[in-house]
């Protein structure tokens, strides 16, 4: 089937070209194997004499011929040889180095001499060294402090404030050991010491309250009264 153009309408020519390109692609013909001319005909780009064919069916029949197939083999053979010669310099250098490899006998001799010159065995990362138990380090004894520093430290320790309960007990003991007291005063003093030792604290208003830092066994809110004779 042929498509002949009538007139000089460029729009019709473009439509015709699109249709021919579509037909060419529909026939699975590579673009570099066929050329479409301006008059709508096809030229074979593989054959050396460039045959011009009117229709796509004629081009398909030409591509099935023996001459075209032989030309196709030559065409792709030249392409393959061209690709082989277009190697980069790095690949060429690698090929040269591979061609200049040493003889296996020389390589084996060099390896034997290197192994003979090695005195220490090769290190293997898989082997672990056995740790020997180290001797305990000698304990360094601190030098004795001078006598003056010892005296200063003992003086500072003696100056530390004593707990409140101990100071109160000492004061009460000093009061008891001092001048003789009447039985009433002694009973009041003993009651005071009993309350202080039980966790009661005077609030400064003549009352006794529980110390927050002391735990009581009972829930009494008032301290025990002064015992009678």
From Swiss-Prot:
- Positions of Matrin-type zinc fingers: 42-74
Pfam families in UniProt: SCNM1_acidic, zf-SCNM1
List modified residues, type Phosphoserine. 2, 182, 218
Task: Identify the GO cellular component terms for this protein.
Answer: nuclear speck; nucleus; spliceosomal complex
Q: Where in the cell is it found?
A: Nucleus, Nucleoplasm; Nucleus speckle
- Renumbered to this chain, motif Bipartite nuclear localization signal spans 4-20
The identity of this protein, by name, is Sodium channel modifier 1
